[in-house]
């Protein structure tokens, strides 16, 4: 751009020597041809990008201008020799504010006055008082032309920008005899000349405007003399109103954003910290319907940014967290194994205390991604590498003196976000979001997968066996073990007594007559009181023995239907045969640690297959016995 300025300055010097006499002769001796008006076709379309120069002949200075417009913004860029480049961005919708940016320093001030390309009072009656843009100057010229005529310079052909230019001149007297005079010259491409290279531009195409204020039309010494020349017409690229990353404009009408609700949401979040060159990738599954939020990642040793949790909150190796707002508990896991089970508390960003109560409720997912305390203003829209259009908002966070840049889709869903250091404009952290379908998320875990976290390993009399009427393993294959587990837990809560589903674990065996027999384990009620959530009464949980007695009563009366969902979408009701119900292990087995002969035989074969000695089997306690020798007891007892 500096090279362009140097060339332009040379041209200014040459053109400044031009004599106004030939044009003033037209004012003194008007041609005999009929005066004509300019065409209003020289107006600019809604979207455009034009470049050129503005020259003040009396000050011997010139400026390069680039102006662009879209439906949302009009942008003017100006550069003058020995001055830092300047940029004005005017909103064309909403509050219609104007922001000024020092392009070199990056300083931005919102809600400033419009710029003045030149401010000469005598010219206001001709081009209007608004000289903030080339667009407004051209509009003023068209409005002036509605009541004024001029003359085309005959037998005078100029080639400007590769097209034949027509010259139109008008001489303007003052309101009184003592008022100064004004000479107005307009050059434009005639309708018969070569058409512009890009549509929607068409001839006549404005090429230049020149205004000279004179004491009278006999004087060739101007009091004020300015010109504007346009040398390029094109369509905007789309990012002309962009403010460089890390810059926030002061004094704008910042507001709290209304983001798209994310009540059912699954996504992969990638947090990147350039200072450590480290990415923390986490998967999140949020369901307001199910009142749960799951988070999983490689490790949370740097904390959980989504919860604003510090590294000290979770142990090294934690890679899964579940917050269950139905029952008020937090579960954590590491490498697929249970790590902790604890009451839900409000030290995490996703847990809110409902106004006027002490009850815990879920924070909105959109506000976990974007701090609801920040106030944003709109910047220019953009398109990412895959063609997704998004809006850009920015806010200043005084707590850590960072600039937050937020990208959202047209319907205001979070697309990505970045934080920049105030002043240096260095990136502090970035967030990119990749949405995934809820149903395909690997975090769609069943309650049985977390039952080991709840179970406090109190094994006495907490397992029973019962046969399902008229069902076989083939029927189970159409439902799945997890599906059966959920159905049994749901049936107990609906038909027997309300119970937290994490207490229920279901497995199966095949009976002697090839029927389906299920093993139901109901863990003892935990001694850990839950967080204070709405809907779950911890005090009503019964002991396992009490639950089993009620289950037996309900099954005997066929009042405990198990509603399962088959893989073809059809629901069925399964019924347990109460006459086959028995405790597992048998009640007459008190204090016995060992195996029957048949069981030992089966276990010996099992141990040989997996390379474990029979001697090792002898130290198995009752817990292993119920899990490993199920088939042995079923066959040999």
Curated annotation (Swiss-Prot):
Compartments reported by the entry: Membrane
Keywords from the UniProt entry: Glycoprotein, Membrane, Transmembrane, Transmembrane helix
UniProt keyword annotation of Zinc present: no
GO cellular component: membrane
All ranges on the Cytoplasmic side of the membrane: 622-637
Record has Phosphoprotein as a keyword: no
Superkingdom: Eukaryota
Species per Swiss-Prot/TrEMBL record: Caenorhabditis elegans
Sites carrying sugar chains: 102, 111, 178, 218, 253, 277, 316, 355, 461, 537, 552
Membrane-crossing segments per the record: 601-621
Protein name stated in the entry: Uncharacterized protein Y92H12BR.3
Lineage of origin: Eukaryota, Metazoa, Ecdysozoa, Nematoda, Chromadorea
Membrane side Extracellular: residue ranges: 1-600
Membrane topology value: Single-pass membrane protein
